[in-house]
């Protein structure tokens, strides 16, 4: 896996987050994909308070304990909630603009660093990967590398809290059957590109994965897994330890 961070001219989400932090408003954050129609991400949603968060995120924050690593922390909404509870939290993101916004918001330890950078400190009791945490793997084949890296960052009795969704509902017919090409790429592998004002990000791979498959891959890496919570629409929170 690469260890890059984003350049500011290729960081539309970070630009939107910093705009909103500084002015209380932001333009349209457009989300493009070769698989779906163009969508828009409400930037205000990235600044949600704990009571505005989906149930799965609230559950993850309840389960967090000890020293916490928040991966892909974005605007820092999860980190700030845990800080207020008195936990020691390190927030990391590959977006320098997001990290700037987090510091302005009061995140005590925000670092612009890639998860796979060897200089990232270790020794965490809880690792959080929220807002479809499996996404950063990009492809199914990269999940073992991701899990092994997370294991290396954990303390002996630590836990990984990660959420995702099973995209099979996209292929569901009215009779309840599914039109999934079993010979093609895994159906949860998608691609996205984001645009904010004149800032155009590079296209990137993103992974949604069903829990049984995620659990089986984690087990090959020596991790035990359990379903911590299920959402209302094929989404779930998993806990690995």
Question: Model-flagged regions — what are they?
Answer:
Residues 43, 47-67:
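Conserved alpha-helix/loop element of class I SAM-dependent methyltransferases that forms part
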């Amino acid at each position: 896996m690469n260890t890059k961070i984003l350049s500011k001219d290729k960081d539309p989400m970070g630009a939107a987050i910093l705009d909103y932090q500084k002015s209380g408003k932001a333009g349209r954050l457009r989300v493009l994909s070769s698989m779906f129609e163009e969508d828009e991400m409400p930037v205000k949603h990235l600044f949600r308070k704990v009571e505005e968060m989906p149930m799965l995120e609230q559950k993850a924050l309840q389960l967090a304990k000890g020293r916490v690593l928040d991966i892909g922390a974005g605007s820092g909404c999860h980190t700030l909630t845990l800080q207020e509870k008195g936990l020691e939290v390190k927030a990391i993101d590959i977006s320098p603009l997001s990290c700037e916004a987090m510091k302005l918001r009061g995140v005590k330890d925000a670092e612009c660093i890639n998860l796979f950078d060897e200089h990232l400190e270790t020794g965490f009791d809880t690792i959080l990967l929220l807002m479809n945490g499996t996404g950063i793997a990009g492809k199914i084949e990269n999940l073992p590398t991701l899990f092994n890296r997370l294991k290396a960052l954990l303390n002996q009795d630590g836990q990984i809290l990660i959420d995702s969704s099973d995209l099979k509902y996209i292929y569901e017919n009215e009779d309840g059957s599914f039109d999934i090409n079993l010979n093609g790429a895994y159906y949860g592998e998608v691609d996205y590109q984001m645009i904010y004002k004149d800032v155009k990000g590079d296209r990137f791979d993103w992974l949604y994965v069903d829990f049984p498959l995620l659990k089986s891959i984690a087990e090959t890496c020596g991790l035990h897994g359990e379903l911590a919570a299920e959402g209302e629409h094929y989404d779930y929170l998993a806990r690995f330890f």
